[in-house]
């Protein structure tokens, strides 16, 4: 059972998450906020709904995380005067500045995870995992 692919993938994901969580904590950033920051660094000015969809979480989860991120000064939420229905999320300078500190941590985790592995095997593993994701899309 422990050698089944699903088990190995889950354990590897847990190990990656655990390592990154510890590194992020040194900067006072939670793993939950990391996902939203990564998305916003690539696509600032999303609605809460768009952010939820891209992060793959429910809107109440996003709303709670954004409330905390706003209190920490990472983001601002705004409504347009002509459309008060949608809430848009914007990074603050503080939220943007975190990128320079946090992205190298994620890169370091990925490097540590594949240390000693042949680059061709890492590339093959990545292709297989991407194929699994594609095959099991809902």
State where each predicted segment sits.
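Charged, amphipathic alpha-helical coiled-coil/dimerization segments
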Residues: 17, 67-127
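Short alpha-helical elements of helix-turn-helix
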Residues: 3-7, 27-38, 63
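Exposed, interaction-prone assembly regions rather than primary DNA-binding/catalytic cores
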Residues: 123-138
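Residues within the alpha-helical elements of helix-turn-helix
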Residues: 39, 54, 72
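N-terminal leader segment of winged-helix/HTH proteins
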Residues: 1-27
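Helix-turn-helix DNA-binding motif, specifically the short coil turn and the N-cap/start of the second
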Residues: 57-61
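Short capping segments at the starts of secondary-structure elements
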Residues: 43-47
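Hydrophobic residues on short alpha-helical segments
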Residues: 37-40, 99
